[in-house]
């Protein structure tokens, strides 16, 4: 909706004339750096939203933008629904072998929420998926979960995104070329530090060259440990990597992430982050339970500057749930 509103607003004739006049007639030498940056950003956004195109091309730009907005939303909705719709139900304690108590408790809680009493449910949400792949001794179950996670929206159902991806690629290319760019990458990078796709590829290739020797060494260490534990004929597969990498880390560094969990309880982490922000920037956070929130898990904090003046409201939304995109917000 915001993308559509921006396109309409920036392409309107009155706004086009005002912004263009302000940009061309303003003596930029008399502007502060902040004013100059603001003017440049507004004008650049105005141009990138098709305001300098002919009327016919503007109509095409609006059509492409609307289609891109709709398809992008559909892509995200499909991924969210596919993620939230998946359940790996474990029926016996034997299937829990290797899992830490925290992961078992979380799986039992998820099962309870889904009405599957006496079972354990693993989902594709990261707080459920990641611990299972790290700690589960059940290789075949790890494979099942890995395949489900890495083939999301690729199945023959209503959530398949393959056609949408193809449409997005074609529409983005058409939009970029309409604005005079060679491709969509050039359009995006015009406002980025890299500026050109060649610079991006150079950075990636430099990183690849620098990291490859160490990465290969680490993979060989993990493979060697796996064969030591499972036999010389053992073939390391993608669903094995996290599991044996965790075992190698424990062997080399005696580091158990589960043992660290009590030190990173959510309230402690929030206090630490808020305290750091106060120390660095002088801003403070005060929870206000009177501010309406969109879900009981959400907390609202008023943010104040060092002089006590109000700056903003911060909403925190840390926990996964159905209907929510992955990650802490």
What are these regions (language model features)?
Residues 44-47, 141-153, 241-258:
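Residues forming anionic-ligand binding surfaces in small-molecule and nucleic-acid pockets
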Residues 24-41, 120-144, 177, 238:
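Acidic, low-complexity proline/glycine-rich segments
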Residues 1-99:
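N-terminal helix-rich structural modules
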Residues 47, 128-132, 153-158, 189-200, ...:
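Second-shell loop/turn segments in exported
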Residues 41, 50-64, 152-187:
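A conserved hydrophobic secondary-structure block that centers on an alpha-helix together
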Residues 19-26, 122-129, 147-163:
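Short, charged, low-complexity loops and linkers
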Residues 34, 38, 67-70, 77, ...:
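Active-site-proximal, well-structured secondary-structure segments within enzyme catalytic domains
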């Amino acid at each position: 909706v915001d993308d559509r509103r921006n396109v309409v607003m920036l392409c309107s004739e009155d706004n086009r004339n005002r912004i263009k006049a302000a940009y061309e007639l303003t003596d930029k030498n008399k502007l502060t750096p902040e004013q100059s940056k603001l003017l440049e950003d507004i004008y650049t956004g105005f141009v990138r939203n098709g305001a300098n195109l002919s009327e016919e091309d503007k109509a095409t730009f609006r059509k492409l933008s609307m289609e891109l907005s709709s398809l992008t939303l559909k892509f995200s909705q499909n991924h969210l629904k596919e993620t939230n719709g998946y359940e790996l139900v474990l029926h016996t304690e034997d299937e829990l072998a290797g899992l830490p108590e925290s992961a078992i408790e979380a799986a039992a809680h998820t099962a309870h929420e889904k009405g599957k009493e006496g079972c354990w449910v693993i989902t594709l949400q990261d707080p459920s998926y990641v611990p299972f792949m790290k700690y589960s001794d059940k290789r075949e179950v790890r494979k099942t979960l890995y395949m489900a996670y890495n083939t999301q929206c690729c199945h023959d159902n209503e959530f398949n995104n393959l056609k949408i991806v193809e449409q997005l690629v074609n529409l983005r290319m058409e939009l970029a070329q309409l604005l005079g760019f060679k491709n969509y990458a050039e359009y995006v990078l015009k406002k980025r530090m890299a500026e050109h796709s060649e610079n991006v590829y150079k950075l990636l290739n430099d990183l690849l060259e620098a990291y490859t020797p160490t990465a290969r060494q680490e993979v060989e260490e993990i493979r060697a440990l796996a064969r030591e534990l499972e036999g010389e004929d053992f073939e390391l597969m993608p669903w094995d990597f996290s599991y044996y990498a965790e075992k190698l880390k424990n062997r080399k560094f005696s580091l158990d992430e589960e043992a660290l969990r009590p030190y990173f309880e959510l309230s402690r982490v929030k206090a630490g982050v808020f305290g750091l922000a106060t120390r660095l920037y002088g801003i403070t956070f005060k929870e206000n339970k009177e501010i309406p929130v969109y879900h009981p898990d959400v907390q609202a904090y008023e943010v104040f500057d060092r002089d006590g003046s109000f700056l903003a409201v911060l909403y925190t939304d840390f926990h996964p749930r159905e209907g929510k995109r992955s990650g802490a917000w």
